[in-house]
Regions:
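Disordered inhibitory propeptide/activation segment of secreted metzincin zinc metalloprotease zymogens
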Residues: 1-97, 148
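Metzincin-family zinc-dependent endopeptidase catalytic domain
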Residues: 25-64, 100-237, 241, 290-294, ...
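A short, flexible beta-alpha/helix-coil linker loop
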Residues: 74-79, 89-92, 171-175, 232-233, ...
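Low-complexity, polar/charged sequence tracts that form flexible coils or short amphipathic helices
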Residues: 163, 169, 184, 277-278, ...
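Beta-propeller domains
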Residues: 281-344, 349, 353
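Extracellular, beta-strand-rich repeat scaffolds characterized by small/acidic residue-biased motifs
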Residues: 290, 299-301, 310, 340-345, ...
Length: 414
């Protein structure tokens, strides 16, 4: 559980709205390298925001942590020591956010609330009030702030700029939208926005930690948006127009943030079926808090490799000219029980929950893994392996190869 051992309860953040008193604390590492390597090692442990004592009673849901944010205007105010860096070479020229950008920023916080136990509350900047997380577009030119990449987000701390997110002027006309976004590139403005919000919530780049290593094979944006290494990411082209396939927080981002703040155990807690369009590429991670759930690719014609194991990825075969390995993740501690393949020759792997796995058409390979599973090859010449548990394997059609594996298995013929 996040914050199980407090090392230090810090002072109040220095640039927050006047009635708040939002504070931070430093907690112990989780003991899991792929989580702890995403935290700063310049303190005794990772830093996180405590719930806002002024807003908590009104906005906390089921014990959620309340964190305020604000979107600075072109008349934003600062505490006198806000820009107290190593030198005084800062030049500030305010640029207001467009209304569409504000809508997209709010939508980003909605995404974060889906998988973390955080309620984000927007406060208006007026009369010296500002949120603990604060957004700007401006022309800060000091090299001490490190804006060479176009944006910066400060970690939770007690100094005035802690939690603040600053974009360079070139973002003034950018779209922070999600989905397929025209001209967004392979690392979209929304990915930059997500990256910086995650800094403001307390996580760092993989590879920054001096003693704990992030898995080297996972240092790509499809595993964590905290890296700038894109791997096999590519734009999607349709009718002569190039679109960015926009991604949000991925498997390892979610793991680190859930350690800090806990998980939203209400999100998708019922019985959910995840449908996708074969002509619409995506990169995403599923957080599902409960119920009996299904990944359904029955409307796809190309082969997919589908894994229901938490923390692992699936490679989805789209019916358009776009491909990327490992584009769909399932968060650690999320359980998806069932999966349906499409018309291609799919490879489907279950988990210990007791799965219903359907290959549909094509020559499929299905592995139930542990648990009491139901395996359906359906059409095609399939390979069906029950593995552990007491499985029921259906030889539905075609020349199937069946291996029961461990347990008391049953084979049923069509």
């Amino acid at each position: 559980m996040a914050g199980s051992t407090i090392i230090e309860a810090s002072a109040i953040n220095g640039q927050t709205y006047s009635s708040s008193g939002q504070s931070i604390e430093i907690i112990k590492n989780s003991g899991t390298d792929y989580i702890d390597s995403l935290f700063s090692d310049y303190y005794e442990g990772p830093r996180k925001w405590n719930t806002d004592p002024y807003l908590d009673s009104k906005y906390s849901k089921d014990g959620s942590i309340v964190i305020s944010y604000s979107i600075a205007s072109d008349t934003a105010l600062y505490s006198p020591d806000y820009f107290a860096m190593e030198d005084n070479s800062v030049v500030y020229e305010p640029i207001p956010f467009a209304e569409t950008q504000k809508v997209d920023i709010r939508a980003a916080f909605t995404k974060f609330s889906e998988f973390t136990n955080i309620s984000f509350i927007e406060v208006n900047e007026a009369d010296n009030n500002a949120g603990s997380i604060r957004f700007f577009i401006n022309s800060l030119l000091s090299s001490t702030i490190g804006l060479l990449g176009g944006a910066v987000g400060d970690q939770p701390d007690k100094n005035p700029q802690a939690g603040d997110i600053i974009f360079r002027p070139e973002f003034a006309d950018k779209s922070f939208a999600q989905g397929l976004v025209e001209g967004a590139g392979t690392y979209s403005p929304f990915a930059v926005l997500t990256h910086e919000i995650q800094h403001a919530l307390g996580i760092e780049h993989p590879g920054d930690h001096r003693t704990i290593s992030f898995p080297e094979e996972k240092i790509f944006t499809k595993y964590t948006v905290m890296t700038g290494i894109e791997g096999d990411a590519q734009p999607y082209r349709k009718d002569g127009i190039e679109y960015g396939v926009v991604q949000a927080s991925m498997v390892y981002d979610i793991a680190a943030l859930q350690y800090l703040y806990g998980a939203n155990m209400s999100h998708n807690s019922g019985n959910n079926t995840y449908f996708y369009k074969p002509d619409t590429p995506f990169i995403e991670t599923i957080w599902d808090a409960g119920g009996t759930d299904t990944l359904d690719f029955s409307n796809f014609s190309k082969a997919s490799t589908i894994s229901l194991i938490g923390g692992e990825y699936s490679t989805i075969g789209f019916d358009v000219d776009w491909s990327m390995s490992n584009n769909l993740g399932i968060a650690f501690n999320a359980t998806i029980e069932n999966a349906s393949g499409g018309a291609g020759s799919d490879n489907i792997t279950g988990n210990p929950s007791g799965n219903i796995l359907k290959g549909n058409a094509g020559d499929d390979t299905i592995n139930g893994k542990e648990g009491n599973d139901q395996l359906h090859g359906d059409g095609g010449n399939d390979f069906l392996y029950g593995d552990g548990g007491n499985d029921t394997i259906f030889a539905d059609g075609g020349s199937d190869t069946i291996q029961g594996g461990a347990g008391l298995d049953t084979i049923k013929y069509a």
